Amino acid sequence: ITTVGLKRLAVATLFACGIVHAQSTVPVMQPTEGDFEARDFHFQSGQTLPTVKLHYATLGTPTRGADGKVNNAVLLLHGTTGTGRAYLTPLMQKELFAAGQPLDASRYYIIMPDGIGRGGSSKPSDALRANFPRYGYNDVVEGHYRLLTEGLKVDHLRLVLGTSMG
């Protein structure tokens, strides 16, 4: 290795250490996670399940207006093959949820559900396999609606934001 090669290696090492340090100093927010069981779930295919588990993660705290209703809820929807945890990377937390950012978790109640068929929500591979009802996007939307209104008692959203099919 030449002197020039050693200098380049030293600069690259310092640069890499700086990136690792910068990423490690981002405060990581711990979400609250939960499951809601939607009872007597009717799929658009005409099939019904006695319960459908809908998994979710939240950041922030719900606040209620004078009418007692949650008034700071935001719904973030993942893409077709993702989960709600897609929004919980250190970079997303820093750019979206940190103090002063667009979805500051100290101001908003951020809800990140797993759609039917994904993550911790009910899906064919849980047990029913081929006997799991045929489901589509309308069923996923119905699941989100029931999670919000029945499970989390949220009937108004400040924002709905998604990636891809979210």
What do the predicted segments below correspond to?
Residues 127-140:
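Catalytic nucleophile-loop/oxyanion-hole region of alpha/beta-hydrolase
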Residues 13-22:
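Hydrophobic h-region of N-terminal signal peptides that target proteins for export
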Residues 160-162:
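Short beta-strand immediately N-terminal to the catalytic nucleophile in serine-hydrolase-like folds
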Residues 138-158:
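Conserved acidic catalytic loop of the alpha/beta-hydrolase fold
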